[in-house]
From Swiss-Prot:
Gene: acxB
Annotated organism of origin: Xanthobacter autotrophicus (strain ATCC BAA-1158 / Py2)
Signal peptide positions (record): none
Cofactor notes: Zn(2+). The heterohexamer contains tightly bound iron, manganese and zinc ions.
GO BP terms, alphabetized: cellular detoxification of acetone
Name recorded for this polypeptide: Acetone carboxylase alpha subunit
Post-translational modification: The N-terminus is blocked.
Length: 776
C-alpha cells in the first residue's frame, strides 16, 4: 500500500488537511482498512525506505529519537513541580498523521498510547471541521474515558504542518500535583464517581498561533489547588512539543518530505516486526495462565465516601491467559476479570494496553524503537464491563495504577517462565512492586498558600528478582523505569513536612534464592502547616506482587500515623524521639517514645483525608519487589550480608532462609555453616511432614467451594467474574468438577451491587464516537 493518497480519488471532494488532500478520518480509515486486510500496519508489505536507503532511514530515526529525548531533558528543567523536575514524570511522543506513534522519549512511556488515543478521538469525532485543526494550534486533554490513565496526567498536543498540510502530531505529558478533585493531591480517594475526579478536559483547543487562550488560562488556574505548578508544567509541555515540531520541520527541509512521510509509517511496521522477531527469539509457544489480586478495603471507618453502595471491601481480580504462537504473534486475554467498581482504581483499555510496554522495553523489546507497532503486533481481549474496560461513564479513574500494577505483575511472571525455558535467565523478572505508598494531602502550606502535595518518593521502589541476581533496591517504578526518590531538601521546599528519617525498609523485598529489591521509608513530621490533611494509599491486606518459582511475595503495606504527639515538648526536653525508620513493625520502638499520642498502626493502607497538625507524624513506606527461587537455596553469606546492610531483619534469617547467624565482636553478623546445614535439613523435613498429595488438597478445597465457604469479598469477586466471563466460569466449573446446580449469583451475597445490571457507556452520549482498541 502507498501511504500517500491517490490524488485521482479526490476529484470533486472537499480537500482535507492531511498531506495529499485527505481528511484526517479518511486517512486513518484507509490505513486501518489496509492494516486489517493484510495484518501489516498500513498494508506495508515492504519497508521501502528502510530497505532501499537504510542509512537515511537510520539517520532519520537517530536524529528524531535524539530530538525527542533532548526535548524531554530540556523541558524538565522548566518545570517547577518536583514530580517532573526530580522524578522525570514527563514524556514526549512523535505521531504520524493518523495518530500512531513512531518515536517516543524516555520517561512515562505508557503515554505512547494515551496521547495517541486522544488524537484518534479527535480524528474520529471530526475535530478537523469543528473546532478545526490548524498550524500552531495547541490542544489539551486528560479525559480517562477516551484513553488517559488518570486525570492528573495532562496532555498537550500540537499538530505539525508542512507547506500547509498536516504531516503529524507531537504530544507531551506531565503528571501534575493536583487536579481539583474532591480531595487534594493528584490521586484522591474520597470520590467514587468520575464527577469527583477533578478537572476534566476532552481534547480541548486551548491555544492558537502558539499562544494559549486567555479564557483557558483564567479558567484552568482556578480549577486546581496548585496554580503555579499547573501553569509552569503546561509551559514545560508546550516547550518540549515546540522543540520537536521545529526539529521535524528541519528534518523535512533537509531530507525531503517524501523521506519523512515514508519513515513516519514504516517505523510503526518496523516496530511490529521487531516485536514479532523478539517473541520468536525469546519465548516458547504455548498457553500461559497467571492471576493478580489487590485489596479495596473501603468498609473501614477511616475511608469516608459519599455513597453507601461504595462502602464495602472488595478484591480486584485479573486472570491473564497469554497465548504465544509459533509465528511470533501472541494474544493476551483477561477473561474473568472483575467488574469496575465504585472507587478510583478503574482503568481505560488504552492505559492497560499501552502501559505494559514500560516493562516490555526492559526485557522483551529493549529498543529505542518504542512505538505503536508493538500494540499492532499484540491481540488484546479485555471484556467490556471489567475494571480495565468499563461500560459506564460514571467510573472514576483517579488512581488507576492501584489495579494496573497489581494486574501486570502476573503478566511478567508468565513471560518470565517463558524466558526461563529459553535460557534467558537475566531477563526473568519475578514481578513489579506495588508502587506505593502515596503520601498525599493539602491545606495551607509553609508559605501560607492553598496547596496540595503528592510525594513521588515511590518512583523508587524495589524491583523483582531475576533468575541470576537480586532485584534492585529503592530504584524504580513500573510506570517509570528511570524513576528517582528525589532529594529530601526539594521535597521539604514543596511540602510542609520535615524529614525525621529515611532508610531502607528491611525485609520489604520478597525472600528467595535471589531476593527482591527492598523499598525504603521516610518519616515525616508536619511543620508550619495550617488546616492540613493527608491520607494513605497502597496495598495492605493483600500482597499484589507474588514471587516466582518458590520466591516469596514482597511485604504488603501498612500505615503508621501519630497525632497529638507532644513532640514539641519532647524535643525541648531532649528526650528520645522517633528518628530513622520503623525498622521492625512487629516490634515497634516509636510507640513507646510517644506515650500520650494517638497512634494508628494497622493494615488499613488506604484512607481518605485525615486532619494533621504540626508535630504529627506520617510514615511513608515504599514497597519492595518479589523474590525468585527457594529461600533455602540462597547463599548463606548473602543472608548475613543482607542483615549487615539493613536489607533483612535478623529474625528472618532462620525462619525463612534457614541460616544460623552469629554476631561478632565488631557488630557484624557471620554464618554458622554447620548450624545452617542442620537448620535447612530440618526445614525440608518439616515441609515434607506438612505436605499432602495434591489430589487430597483439591478434595478439601472443592468441599469449601461447594459450601461457598469463603469470605464475602472472595465470593463477590468470583460472582462478578463469572457474570462477565462465561468462559472463565465454565473453566472454573470443569476444573473443580462442580455440578450444574452450584451457582454463585451476586444477589445472594448480601452486598450492594449497584452498576452490575445497569450502565451507560460514553458512546451513548450525543454525537460521541469512541475508538475501539481491543477485542471486547
Amino acid at each position: 500500500m502507498n501511504v500517500t493518497v491517490d490524488q485521482s480519488t479526490l476529484a470533486g471532494a472537499t480537500r482535507g488537511i492531511v498531506r495529499g488532500g485527505e481528511t484526517l478520518k479518511e486517512h486513518r480509515d484507509r490505513l486501518m482498512a489496509a492494516t486489517k486486510a493484510t495484518g501489516r500496519y498500513a498494508g506495508l508489505k515492504t519497508l521501502e525506505l528502510r530497505e532501499r536507503e537504510p542509512i537515511l532511514y537510520n539517520k532519520l530515526f537517530s536524529r528524531l529519537r535524539a530530538g525527542v529525548v533532548d526535548a524531554r531533558e530540556t523541558a524538565k528543567k522548566i518545570a517547577a513541580s518536583p514530580i517532573v523536575e526530580q522524578e522525570g514524570e514527563l514524556c514526549f511522543t512523535l505521531y504520524n498523521a493518523a495518530g500512531d506513534s513512531l518515536l517516543t522519549s524516555t520517561g512515562i512511556i505508557i503515554h505512547v498510547g494515551t496521547m495517541g488515543a486522544a488524537i484518534k478521538y479527535m480524528i474520529e469525532n471530526n475535530w478537523e471541521a469543528n473546532p478545526g485543526v490548524h498550524d500552531k494550534d495547541i490542544f489539551c486533554n486528560n479525559d480517562s474515558l477516551i484513553g488517559n490513565v488518570h486525570p492528573c496526567d495532562i496532555h498537550t498536543i500540537v499538530p505539525i504542518f508542512w507547506e500547509g498540510e498536516l504531516i503529524g502530531w507531537v504530544g507531551g505529558v506531565t503528571h501534575v500535583i493536583d487536579t481539583g478533585a474532591v480531595g487534594p493531591g493528584s490521586m484522591a480517594t474520597g470520590q467514587v464517581q468520575r464527577f469527583g475526579d477533578g478537572y476534566s478536559i476532552t481534547c480541548r483547543k486551548v491555544g492558537a498561533n502558539d499562544t494559549l487562550f486567555r479564557d483557558w488560562l483564567h479558567e484552568s488556574q482556578r480549577m486546581v489547588r496548585t496554580t503555579r505548578y499547573w501553569m509552569l508544567d503546561e509551559r514545560t509541555r508546550i516547550a518540549g512539543c515546540h522543540m520537536i515540531r521545529k526539529l521535524v520541520e528541519e528534518v523535512v527541509a533537509e531530507e525531503g518530505i517524501e523521506a519523512y512521510w515514508k519513515f513516519a509509517y514504516e517505523a510503526v511496521e518496523h516496530g511490529r516486526l521487531g516485536l514479532q522477531a523478539r517473541i520468536k527469539a525469546m519465548t516458547i509457544p504455548g498457553t500461559y495462565r497467571q492471576v493478580g489480586f489487590v485489596d479495596v478495603p473501603y468498609a473501614h471507618e477511616d475511608v469516608r465516601v459519599p455513597s453507601d453502595f461504595a462502602k464495602l471491601d472488595t478484591i480486584m481480580h485479573a486472570p491473564c491467559e497469554m497465548t504465544i504462537r509459533r509465528d511470533g504473534t501472541w494474544r493476551l486475554d483477561f477473561e474473568g476479570s472483575s467488574r469496575w467498581g465504585w472507587h478510583t482504581y478503574n482503568a481505560h483499555q488504552v492505559s492497560f494496553t499501552s502501559g505494559i510496554w514500560v516493562m516490555m522495553t526492559q526485557t522483551l523489546i529493549p529498543s529505542e524503537m518504542i512505538n505503536d507497532g508493538a500494540a499492532y503486533g499484540t491481540e488484546f481481549r479485555l471484556p467490556k464491563g471489567t475494571w480495565m474496560n468499563p461500560d459506564d461513564r460514571r467510573v472514576a479513574f483517579s488512581y488507576s495504577w492501584h489495579f494496573l500494577v497489581s494486574a501486570w505483575t502476573a503478566l511478567w511472571r508468565g513471560l518470565s517462565r517463558s524466558y526461563f525455558g529459553r535460557g534467558y535467565l537475566e531477563e526473568v523478572n519475578a514481578g513489579n512492586a506495588n508502587t506505593s505508598n502515596w503520601l498525599q494531602g493539602g491545606g495551607f502550606n509553609q508559605y501560607d498558600e492553598i496547596h496540595a502535595v503528592n510525594s513521588f518518593e515511590c518512583a523508587a521502589n524495589g524491583t523483582g528478582a531475576t533468575a541470576v541476581q537480586d532485584g534492585l533496591s529503592h530504584a524504580a517504578a513500573i510506570w517509570n523505569p528511570e524513576g528517582d526518590m528525589g532529594d529530601m531538601e526539594i521535597w521539604e521546599l514543596a511540602e510542609p513536612l520535615v524529614y525525621l528519617g529515611r532508610q531502607i525498609k528491611a525485609s520489604s523485598g520478597g525472600s528467595g534464592k535471589y531476593r527482591g529489591g527492598c523499598g525504603f521509608e521516610s518519616l515525616r513530621m508536619v511543620w508550619n502547616a495550617k488546616d492540613w490533611t493527608m491520607f494513605f494509599m497502597g496495598n495492605g491486606h493483600i500482597s499484589s506482587d507474588w514471587g516466582l518459582m518458590g520466591g516469596y511475595p514482597a511485604a504488603s503495606g501498612y500505615r503508621f500515623a501519630a497525632h497529638k504527639t507532644n513532640l514539641k515538648e519532647l524535643i525541648a526536653s531532649g528526650a528520645e524521639i522517633p528518628l530513622g525508620g520503623d525498622t521492625d513493625p512487629e516490634n515497634p520502638t516509636w510507640d513507646a517514645m510517644l506515650p500520650d499520642a494517638q497512634i494508628k498502626r494497622d493494615k488499613q493502607a488506604i484512607t481518605t483525608e485525615e486532619m494533621f497538625s504540626d508535630y504529627d507524624l506520617y510514615l511513608n513506606y515504599m514497597r519492595g519487589g518479589p523474590g525468585f527461587g527457594d529461600p533455602l537455596d540462597r547463599e548463606p553469606q548473602a543472608v548475613a550480608d543482607d542483615i549487615n546492610g539493613g536489607y533483612v531483619l535478623e529474625r528472618f534469617a532462620g525462619e525463612v532462609y534457614g541460616v544460623v547467624v552469629r554476631k561478632g565482636a565488631d557488630g557484624q553478623y557471620g554464618v554458622d555453616e554447620a548450624g545452617t546445614a542442620a537448620a535447612r535439613a530440618q526445614i525440608r523435613k518439616d515441609r515434607l511432614a506438612k505436605s499432602v498429595p495434591v489430589s487430597e488438597w483439591m478434595k478439601g478445597e472443592r468441599e469449601k467451594i461447594l459450601a461457598k465457604d469463603a469470605g464475602t469479598q472472595v465470593r463477590q469477586m468470583f460472582a462478578a467474574s463469572f457474570k462477565l466471563g462465561p468462559r472463565f466460569e465454565k473453566d472454573f466449573r470443569t476444573f473443580w468438577s462442580l455440578p450444574d446446580s452450584w451457582t454463585l449469583p451476586e444477589e445472594e451475597i448480601g452486598v450492594p451491587t449497584y452498576g452490575s445490571r445497569y450502565s451507560m457507556d460514553i458512546s451513548e452520549l450525543p454525537d460521541v464516537h469512541t475508538v475501539q482498541f481491543v477485542e471486547e
